[in-house]
Design a protein with these regions (language model features):
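Short conserved loop adjoining the S-adenosyl-L-methionine
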Residues: 144-149
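N-terminal accessory regions of S-adenosyl-L-methionine
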Residues: 1-80, 200, 208-211, 222, ...
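Glycine-rich helix-loop-beta junction characteristic of Rossmann-like nucleotide cofactor-binding loops
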Residues: 82-88
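Class I SAM-dependent methyltransferase SAM/SAH-binding core
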Residues: 100-143
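A short glycine-rich, Lys/Arg-flanked "PGG" loop and its adjoining helix->strand segment in the class I
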Residues: 170-181
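Conserved class I S-adenosyl-L-methionine
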Residues: 90-99
Length: 261
């Protein structure tokens, strides 16, 4: 791994700015379901479960700096592995927005006894996940199905809840109803970045342009004040892709309240 020199960094920042000024860049939301179906369908057809967005750029982010010579996928897996070891020890573990299921393999390697469930809104994803021997089911963040989670389950998302933008409350309500033991997020969280720093500012602007998660941590903090959840961790991972510092970490759990007789 090497930090970019001044000339390389200036060139990279210009490239980021060009993306931010490009009006053809698509934004997230329910309208993009067909594109995700097509993308995961290509992975299904090829038999390769690595998402195509990995390796798109030779430059990544590390501790607030631009670097080269790193493998973004392996950097992300280091986060998934460490969080799985610490938090995902349950008998049933659910990934929401699992895509090709590549993160399910990582979690299964850590918790070999767990039953893994991969939920996604595309049929191609469910075919991939079921072919891997996991439980693949249809689930839409925007309109959560009434699928009951197993008791004391572990839940996680990796760069998938980002697609909901500001429409995440239905999903949170679904989780509060099902009361998993823990919820692990690896997602772009603008509240955790420092807008007074150039690369963070550009990352926040990219999140806004793509209409990624906005106000999610703030919403969770409001729920915590109301006594509905407990936030265990909320921090940056120090790892990101070229355009975005998108692998921040939030860990929370619902608070169980006994009913008065």
């Amino acid at each position: 791994m090497k930090y970019l020199n001044k000339k390389e960094e200036e060139k990279a920042i210009i490239q980021i700015l060009e993306v931010l000024l490009d009006n053809s860049v698509p934004f997230s939301g329910a309208h993009r379901k067909k594109q995700w179906e097509k993308g995961w369908g290509e992975n299904l057809e090829s038999g390769n479960i690595t998402p195509k967005y990995f390796g798109k750029y030779p430059v990544q982010r590390f501790n607030g700096r631009l670097v080269k010579g790193c493998n973004e996928k392996q950097m992300l897996y280091s986060i998934v592995d460490s969080l799985a070891k610490k938090y995902l020890k349950q008998a049933d573990i659910y990934e929401f927005g699992c895509g090709t299921g590549h993160n399910l393999w990582r979690v299964k390697a850590i918790n070999k006894k767990a039953k893994l469930h991969g939920f996604d809104w595309t049929k191609s994803s469910q075919k991939i996940v079921n072919s891997m021997g996991f439980d693949g089911q249809n689930f839409d963040f925007f309109n959560p199905a009434d699928i009951k989670l197993e008791k004391n389950a572990g839940v996680y998302t990796v760069a998938s809840l980002e697609q909901t933008g500001t429409n995440y409350r239905k999903f949170v309500s679904y989780l509060l109803k099902n009361k998993p033991e823990v919820v692990v997020h690896i997602e772009p969280i603008p509240e955790l970045l420092d807008s007074s720093k150039l690369l963070d500012y550009l990352s926040i602007q990219y999140m806004s342009k793509r209409k990624y998660l906005s106000g999610y941590l703030t919403y969770l903090e409001e729920l915590e004040k109301k006594g509905k959840i407990k936030i265990i961790e909320a921090r940056r991972s120090g790892i990101g892709s070229f355009l975005i510092d998108g692998y921040s970490i939030i860990i929370w759990k619902p608070i169980w309240k006994k009913q008065n007789n």
